Amino acid sequence: MVLKSKQWDYLSKCWHLTPREIQVAKLVCKGLDNEQIGQKLQIEYNTVRAHLGNIFHKVGVRGKANLILEFVAVLQRAKI
């Protein structure tokens, strides 16, 4: 799923996501797994997991699929 810059800005503001959390979320939405995300961002696998845990907690979801569904739902409600 590819989102526009203003959509990412909106999502970031909704849940107070850090710039690194947004980077991780963008790669999740592109379908990358944790190992690929770590390689792309040059961070450890466990660091990716920590960022995802923080994102899931802030957004109130469990898992990548639910994260993407919540992003879509929020953007549809906001008509962005």
Regions found by a protein language model. Give the residues of each.
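The N-cap/first-turn positions of alpha helices
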Residues: 20-24
